[in-house]
Structure formats: structure tokens, C-alpha cells
Amino acid sequence: MNYEEAVAYIEDIPRFTTKNSLDHTRECLRRLGDPQRKFRVIHVAGTNGKGSTCAFITSVLREAGYSCGLFTSPHLVEINERFQINEEVIDDDTFLRAFEKVKKLSDELVAEGSYHPTYFETLLLMGMVIFAEAGVDYVTLETGLGGRLDATTAVENPAACVITSISLDHMQYLGNTVSEIAGEKAGIMVPGVPVIYDGNDPDAAGVMREHAEKLGCPYYELKREDTEIHKITKDGIRFSLKDKTYGDTVFDIPFIARYQVMNAALAVKTIQVLENQIPVSLEALKAGMAKTRWQGRMETVLPGVIVDGAHNEDGVEKFVETAEHFQKEIPLTLLFSAVDDKDYTDMIRTICSRIRFRHVIVTQVGGYRKVPVEELAEIFREDGVPEVEAIEDVPAAFERAAKEKGEDGMLFCVGSLYLVGEIKAVIRRKKL
């Protein structure tokens, strides 16, 4: 197979396999030579902020001189984005070599009457092969869904576990309450391994403490009051962590969203907790935070154009918190879309209750999961936005929204990671 055929094969996997057990994933890893044992892992779970926290940690470790792998999901434009080595997306040849090894294993398993690896399992196995062959020191590993039964949990003996904010999402798989979902996320904890977690939700925090104590894990809880924001500009945020280790140290991050401060704080705390295993100077810590790059989360893709993959109640609440800061002085335009398994009605109502946009445009994404543009437009109208443009084609909708933004405004593109991916693809095509 060539690269394009390999990608097509992987994308077709969900059609002919089902969820496998962690024992199945462990057996696959064993037959691949246990590549995950050739590096140390920092395992990250949570509802929102996983990818950003992974990116902060990876950037700091790179600045400190360590070789790092980064495994995240989903991808926005190309599947290779899920695998980074030293903050660079892998090339097609590296992808194909790993795929061929995992495909050979998959064929052997099926011939033996066992199960083909799932879509996510296949990508995880490829990632472990890629990082082992690259000889990295550390891998920052983001869970796919949940934690307890997530395929990444088969990668045992992490250096630390990190759990970001917990909220209601993927309820059909993880549970109907924050506590139930937190229990699934806490499933990544390993006896004796330190865990650093977002403690802002009291129900989730209680579950984290209970699990950590039961497993004998040293645990570190962070809340918003443990941080102080000094300044927010169009270029980023300056904040400090109320921690005796860092005293008056101020950190700069290149993101405008307030919620990124908690993700950054979790990363800083993780580096601190691991200081005896992974020495990092204060200078490297500060520089790594300032240089962090992450796609699709309050990311500035063009001057004045921000894309954010907020797609659930917690994510939208955090988006609104950021937009509120800018609406006082800058006219705002919104490009919105959503997929049908998200609570887009409540998302829109939250946005409309607190933000007044100069112009609103809706579009549709997600293939068979798309929500018709007129349905989205009608919800905006019901929530007090009489003038809403409905444009099905994403490139046309983005072009219209960018024009409405004008020279003095800001354009926020929100509601779905699919929307973020399509917009980034549009921008990339224009640059070619």
C-alpha cells in the first residue's frame, strides 16, 4: 500500500471492527515488541483541555533538551497530526512504515480468529512504534475517550497522570453525571504514580481524591484560585501560579483564552512534581510555556481570526468567558457550526445570552452528523439574533465571515472541531 491507501484503510476500520479489551491492546503491544517500554509516558485524560495540556508539557520538555513524542486526537486536517516528534508532525514515510507493521499484525490476528484492532487502537499501536523507533525520551499521551477502558491505558507505568477539567460529554459512553465521568477518567491512575488534576468541580475533585487515596497515589489538586492572571492581550496571557516553588515567577502563554491558564498551570505543576525524575530549569519552563503551539483551541490562524473547537457546555462557557473580555472594545463576528450529537441548542443559548456579535454566520459540517444551517439559524433568531446568514459551504461561509470582520474586528469560528479543521484546510489551500 502507498500512503493514501493506508489512510483510506484506517478510515474504513470502524466499519468492520468493534471495541476491544485492554488485554487485546496489551497483546498487540507485546507482539510488536512492547515499543512503549522504550520511553517514559505522561498520561493525560479529561473532558476539555487534554490536548493543550499535552502541548504545554511537551513544549517545556523540548525546551529542556529532551526528545519527545506527542500522541493526540482528533486530527483537524491530516491524520499525521496525531503523531508529533519534537513538536513536528511526522512525515508520510514514517506514517507508512508504522502502518505496515501494525497492518501485518492485524492480518495475523484475524487469520488466528482474533479481533482486528479498532481505529483508535491501530493509531495508538502505530504511535508507540513511531516513538520507539525515533528513540524519544518521553511521550505525552492523550486518552481517546474516557480513561478506564481507553486503549492508551494499556501503556502501563507512566511517570505521571494528569486529569484536566471534567464536564458532561460523551454521556452515552461515560455516564450521566460529572461524578460518573470523573470515575472513568480516574481510571488512568496507577498505584503509586503521582496524579495532578483540575479540582474546580467539587464532584469531580472528590472522585479524584478518593481514587488517588485508594491507589496510594501522591495527588496534587489545582483550582482557579491557585492562579493569578496579570494581563490578557490579543497576543496572549501573563499569569502566575500561587506556589512557593515559583514565588513571584510570571509565565507567558501565547493563547488568549482564560481557560488555557488552568491547562498551563496543570503542566507547570506536572513539571514541578517530576523534577526529581525530569530536571527542568526555570528558564526552560518559562520559555517552553511561551513557545507552546496548539491547533484548534483559541488559535489565531490569521490576524484577528480565532478558531476554537469548543463543542460542549464547558467548552462553550470558556469560549464565552474569553469573548466577553474582547467585546468591550472590539466588534466581534461569529461563524458557528455543530454536529447533531452535541447539545447545540444550549451552546447557542449560552453564547447569545452573553455576547453581542456584529454579525453571525452559520454553516454545516460533519457529513452524516451535520445540522442543517437553517435549523442553526432559527435557534439564533429565537435567542435574539435577528440577522443570521446561513451558508452551507464552509469556504464560502468563512470568506463571508472574514469580510464582515473588517479591519478592526475579530472573527471567532466556534462549535465543532470539524469546523476548525475545514477552516484550516481552506487557509492552507490559499497559501499553496
What are these regions (language model features)?
Residues 133, 138-143, 149-162, 166-171, ...:
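Nucleotide phosphate-binding/pyrophosphate-handling subdomain across enzymes
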Residues 198-199, 211-233, 253-258, 282-291, ...:
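Beta-strand->loop->alpha-helix junctions that form or flank phosphate-binding loops
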